Regions:
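Conserved small/polar residues in nucleotide/adenosyl-binding loops
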Residues: 169-173
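The catalytic Nudix box helix
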Residues: 85-120, 141
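Acidic, metal-coordinating catalytic segment for phosphate/diphosphate chemistry
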Residues: 19-65
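N-terminal strand-loop-strand
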Residues: 48-85, 113, 117
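Secondary-structure edge/capping motif, primarily at the C-terminal ends of alpha-helices
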Residues: 9-16
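Active-site-adjacent beta-strand/loop module that shapes the phosphate/pyrophosphate-binding cleft
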Residues: 72, 124-149
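Short amphipathic alpha-helical heptad-repeat segments
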Residues: 1-6
Length: 173
């Protein structure tokens, strides 16, 4: 409910023209940050950075992930913290789902790909713990490799194709 209060406050701040209502919506936003801080055990200042710096109508953040298959195995990249994930990341401003997926695969896996089609949408907070203070919609895109090869970089230290039974590796959330 803290996120719902944040959403209501953000929408109110976006559309109100009344100065008194603006003050009320700002207070609702502060209360939502205080609640989230208590629930999450994160410092209030960190929560305020997430909640109170947003402007405009609040929407979920968008993340793309590339589904790349070879010989009935899926490509994963090893992140700097030792966890593994499908190549991908936040959709940058001015990028489309397709262009962001292609860009992220090149950056993280060193591969040139064609983004073929969207194969799944995933609400991160419904399926992963702990929930984020904001909503994330993950878009999974089927990709075909055209070329390239992996080189360690600032985001990833390894890549490989893995059996679809992923129970043996530590997957990032």
């Amino acid at each position: 409910w803290a996120k719902e209060l944040q959403f209501i406050a953000q929408a109110g701040l976006t559309y109100t023209k009344d100065l008194f209502d603006k003050e009320r919506f700002e207070r609702i936003r502060e209360i939502s940050a205080e609640i989230m801080s208590l629930q999450s055990k994160l410092p209030l200042s960190e929560i305020k950075d997430l909640f109170c710096n947003e402007t405009g109508f609040q929407t979920p953040k968008l993340d793309t992930r590339a589904a790349i298959f070879k010989d009935n195995k899926i490509l994963l990249v090893e992140e700097n913290d030792g966890t593994w994930s499908m190549p991908g990341g936040w959709v940058d401003v001015m990028e489309t789902v397709k262009s962001n997926t292609v860009k992220e695969v090149k950056e993280e896996a060193g591969l040139d790909v064609d983004a073929v089609r969207v194969i799944a949408l995933h609400d991160r907070n419904l399926h992963n713990q702990p929930p984020y203070a904001y909503n994330v919609c993950k878009v999974f895109v089927l990709c075909k490799v055209k070329g390239g090869c992996f080189h360690p970089n600032i985001e990833t230290v390894g890549s490989g194709y893995f059996s679809l039974d992923l129970s043996l590796i530590h997957i990032s959330e």
